[in-house]
Amino acid sequence: GLQVSVIGFGGIPIRKLSMREAKNLLAEAVGAGINFFDTAQGYGDSERKMGEGLKEKRKECILATKSPCRTAGEAASHVRKALARLKTDSIDLYQIHHVSKAPELERVLSPGGALEGLIRQKKEGNIKHIGITGHNADLLYNALEQSEELETVQFPFNIIEDGKNERALLKIAKKLGVGTIIMKPLAGGVIPEPELCLRWILQQGVDVIIPGMILSTEIKMNSSLGDKLRPLSPQELSRLKAKVKPMEQDFCRRCLYCEPCPEGIPIYFIQELGDKVKISAVKDMCKEMYASLEKNAEDCTECGECEEKCPYELPIREMLKEKHRLLLES
């Protein structure tokens, strides 16, 4: 039902901009033909900036937000607050944010769960469409199998995170008519050759990609990809694969098989923060989030259980030490 630009606007980085800078950037994005704007309750003041920056162009834009609501009561409360922050009387797409484990999904889909609450919000006209997001493609596949009410699915997909679970999720989404929203198109900013990477993703039949943008040059380059959807040449594909091949050996694919850690260390979350801290726009945010954790990499007892469970045989203990160093250095 939603007619979206193939390149959307990922809303995390604008939390680093002033309100004036954010409004200018959002106006530029709309002017460049971008009409899908993704934000979240957990993205700092991103919702407020989008609400302010897009209010004059509201009819031209599709606003998508999300929250970690797990119950119907939380869903109602979160939607009400999001409406105020986004300065709108109806949100085009509201997603259940970051469903990563089976018990969470069960809670969300059960009577009294978040999905039931969002269905009620949809009937009341506060939201128009319902979606789900997460990093576990296999779990999201199960979610789509279990509920016909989910209209979109948002998940990481890129030339590194291109496994059988991601492909299966794309296939079932297409079969069911569920919209696919691709986050982490550059694997959290670590993949070089951004233009080639985005063009590769567009070749895979996805609906919209939402790279985070903070610069005018990024908007110009990314939006132009939607104007000329040309597949990668064999030479370009070879170049891209050569660039990412060294990264595949120690890249965390966020499958979560390593968890739970006996010591309560949020392994995957630390891996993600450690990758993102290299991006200047979110560097401080990542360090603050790491500092607020109850357990971090220093609490590792070297038991090795995580490495035994990792299907990619990653040296997780060494990776955590490196991420710890990156997240603490000035």
Which residues make up each language-model segment?
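Conserved, mostly hydrophobic/aromatic
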Residues: F9, F37, M50, L63, ...
